[in-house]
A protein has these predicted regions:
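N-terminal leader/targeting segments
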Residues: 1-86
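A structural detector for beta-sheet-dominated domains
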Residues: 10, 33, 86, 124, ...
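A generic structural signal for short, solvent-exposed coil/turn residues
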Residues: 77, 115, 132-134
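Polyanion-binding interface signature
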Residues: 85-95
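Short, hydrophobic/π-rich interface segment
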Residues: 93-120
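Intrinsically disordered, low-complexity boundary segments flanking structured domains
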Residues: 109-110, 127-129
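A short glycine-rich, hydrophobically flanked beta-strand micro-motif that places a catalytic Asp/Glu
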Residues: 120-128
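Polybasic, proline/glycine-rich intrinsically disordered low-complexity segments
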Residues: 129-188
Length: 188
């Protein structure tokens, strides 16, 4: 049973993953723009990934691997990427998976302070079924936004988890308000 957390973030954040040795897989079939590739080329390991057919991987440990792919759905500019964290250890509990994932989120939120007025964040918890085994995870999407509506993450915390609903606080520093995002109900 895999537990998957998906990040969508601006290419300039790729340096963060290399600096802190967080792994990622790179799909060789995806055309990576030069401005993004320069952040990644020193971390690419040309080795087949046994967990994801057709992907190359840079391994960090036995429990986690990250998948990197380019999202160019908006216009012709591939300014965002998707990074998938997949827990390969079946013994990892849902709560522990979330705890580990939030560690990355806290670190990313600290990094985001360097890019004031450039990113927003959307989080949700999701129930995933792969074959006959249920999988748990939550989406963490960092969106690059422009103009006066942009804001950065100052504080991020889980303040309630009840009946499979994960609720997170996001402090919008531009508008000085809390945004609360409720996940769909998780039924096992």
């Amino acid at each position: 049973m895999d537990k998957i957390i998906r990040f969508e973030l601006n290419s300039r954040m790729c340096n963060f993953f290399r600096k802190y040795k967080i792994d990622y897989r790179i799909n060789p079939n995806v055309k990576i723009p030069k401005e993004i590739l320069k952040y990644l080329k020193r971390g690419i390991v040309k080795r087949k990934d046994k967990f994801a057919k057709g992907c190359w991987t840079y391994k960090y440990n036995r429990q986690f691997a990250l998948t990197y792919s380019i999202d160019d759905a908006i216009g012709n500019e591939a300014s965002n990427s998707e990074i998938f964290i997949s827990a390969q250890n079946d013994d990892l509990s849902v709560s522990r998976t979330i705890k580990i994932a939030l560690t990355y989120v806290y670190a990313l939120s600290e990094l985001m302070k360097q890019y004031r007025n450039e990113f927003s964040i959307i989080l949700s918890y999701e129930y995933i079924r792969c074959g006959t085994e249920p999988s748990y995870g939550f989406d963490i999407r960092f969106h690059q936004i422009r103009g006066n509506d942009s804001y950065l993450v100052k504080n991020l915390e889980v303040y309630n988890k009840h009946n499979g609903i994960l609720v997170l606080n996001i402090l919008n520093t531009s508008k000085s308000e809390i945004q609360t995002i409720n996940s769909p109900h998780i039924s096992t």
